[in-house]
């Protein structure tokens, strides 16, 4: 099939996208030795195939460099490296071992495993800890990957596998009921996992600090990690300082680590600038029992002339409004003035119907996706659960013009 159709595919792809400014390189393929069941990366067969495809791309667009993703631990990539303009390596550390005069980058990296809001391996429920300490055998933790590429003088950077969890490849469980991946920086609902904040601390210049885990436990010593881009951080438990740490003391995993004897109450992380001014703060409270549901929306108004969807987040809260981080209450959604498209909770081993109106919360949260009915007025979404106060939210509907804005 490939031999018969590659020219057609290359032509249609480039003609479709060559005016798209987001396209910076053309890739000849990913892990082509595996996907085409060819020989070793140094074989004449695979070199000839890639040379032919590269020539086809260059004939259509010589203005952009070509690249490809290669997975060849210990393999001979010199012949393939000579074909493309920019060399992509899947996994394999920081690429220091590959000899080439071409630009080099991580075309697929990491494959770290985590479940949002879980802080110990839970084999019964097929959930991985949200501490950045688990990866597949061929991959690395997120922090290991970031550190490798930051320390490399040769690499242009790396692409992470993956931004989002996705349905399929529930590595390493690989059996029912696990049905989606655990690789994501965010889960299938789009809810950030803790590792999201590690990346934020590395790449965002806006002051930030993030505590993990939550602060609702039974007892024991708790490993507390802080992700922050501030010059120094300080952790407090119930008003008592547990010590200040400077940026130079940041661990190799891109976080500040404390071991804290658990006591119910409040844990606070402060971030300071170089002059000692407080510029960022995160707080975790000990939660009580679930008491109510609270809804929030990704938008306050929806254009009825569009096919826009509205994403409704449901949080399970205690009577004081604190998120109950281990809550798993079954939540039922209803909507007036619209239609439920689906529900989810982001857990890779949850097999409730995604197109249904009911979902159990996972780590205190679940999601409902709704679509307007085309009429003006308001769309009202309600969430109910046994024994809890219902949550409601309204989204305005109408033919509105949404002004385009530049990213912040």
Segments the model singles out, each with a brief description of its role:
Residues 224-228, 270-271, 307-325, 331, ...:
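Beta-strand-rich structural segments
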Residues 256-262, 355-374:
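Short, hydrophobic beta-strand segments
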């Amino acid at each position: 099939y490939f031999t018969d159709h590659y020219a057609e595919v290359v032509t249609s792809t480039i003609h479709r996208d060559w005016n798209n400014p987001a396209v910076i390189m053309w890739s000849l393929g990913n892990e082509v030795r595996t996907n085409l069941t060819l020989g070793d990366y140094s074989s004449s067969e695979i070199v000839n195939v890639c040379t032919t495809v590269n020539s086809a791309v260059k004939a259509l667009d010589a203005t952009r460099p070509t690249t490809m993703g290669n997975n060849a631990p210990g393999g001979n990539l010199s012949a393939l490296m000579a074909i493309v303009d920019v060399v992509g390596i899947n996994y394999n550390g920081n690429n220091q071992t590959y000899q080439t005069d071409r630009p080099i980058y991580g075309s697929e990296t990491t494959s770290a495993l985590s479940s949002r809001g879980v802080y110990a391996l839970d084999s019964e429920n097929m959930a991985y800890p949200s501490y950045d300490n688990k990866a597949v055998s061929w991959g690395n933790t997120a922090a290991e990957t970031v550190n490798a590429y930051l320390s490399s003088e040769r690499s242009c950077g790396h692409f992470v596998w993956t931004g989002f969890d996705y349905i399929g490849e529930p590595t390493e469980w690989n059996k029912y009921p696990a049905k989606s991946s655990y690789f994501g920086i965010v889960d299938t609902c789009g809810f950030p996992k803790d590792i999201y904040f590690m990346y934020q601390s590395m790449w965002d210049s806006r002051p930030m600090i993030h505590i993990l885990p939550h602060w609702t436990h039974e007892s024991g010593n708790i490993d507390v990690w802080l992700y922050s881009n501030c010059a120094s951080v300080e952790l407090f438990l119930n008003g008592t300082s547990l010590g200040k740490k400077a940026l130079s003391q940041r661990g190799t995993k891109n976080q500040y680590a404390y071991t804290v004897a658990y006591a119910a109450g409040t844990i606070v992380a402060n971030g300071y600038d170089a002059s000692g001014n407080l510029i960022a703060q995160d707080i975790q409270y000990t939660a009580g029992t679930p008491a109510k549901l609270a809804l929030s929306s990704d938008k306050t108004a929806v254009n009825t002339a569009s096919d826009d969807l509205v994403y409704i987040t449901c949080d399970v809260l205690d009577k004081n409004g604190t998120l109950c981080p281990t809550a798993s209450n079954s939540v039922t959604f209803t909507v007036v003035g619209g239609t439920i498209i689906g529900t989810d909770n982001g857990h890779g081993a949850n097999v409730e119907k995604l197109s249904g109106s009911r979902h159990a919360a996972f780590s205190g949260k679940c999601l409902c996706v709704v679509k307007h009915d085309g009429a003006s007025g308001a769309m009202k979404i309600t969430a109910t659960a046994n024994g809890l106060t219902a949550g409601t939210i309204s989204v305005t509907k109408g033919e509105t013009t949404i002004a385009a804005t530049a990213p912040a």
